[in-house]
């Protein structure tokens, strides 16, 4: 029996007497886009931090390829192939695109104590990987701050894919972007899916989710209140579920 790439089983996260997430069960498969939707205060931020290894679940199971895991830090999650692109992107605006692409993972050449950065190779890889995602860079030396918000998201996605992500968690990647830039980001979400990555798309925008999603989970007040598969999902129903909020609690179907 094939296991999902990532699975949460009845996960709860509490902080003292405050329960931030409760009864969260989701499945995330390779080469699919799983959308987790919810308005402000729905519990998305806590769930992202649990998925990315910032928080440990208080209850329930976290499985990666069928094996229960216990992450102590985001580095543990990253080592397991779970990469997260947060809203702030963790890029340095005044640093070049290629330096941002390899920051913390620089390629060196030389031997023994005599080592230096292999700048040429890193520039070549940056161009190749971005081109594979459909981004034709003018110059990898340009500061990443000169790129649009959508293009910076694309660089962050390509970086995660190159460094071995099996699961890519995107935290509100289209938030605060215009129509054109949102379209650019959604294009690269699908490009990651086509490369076999299991994508988790966190958003409060049902229209953006419906354009790329294969599976949809709706959160409200920290609980999973509805789930849909692409084959049975309807944009109007998804939008109504988002707008209905508490009226949807207790309804779940696949």
Name the predicted role of every residue range.
Residues 2-251:
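Glycine-rich phosphate-binding loops of nucleotide-dependent enzymes
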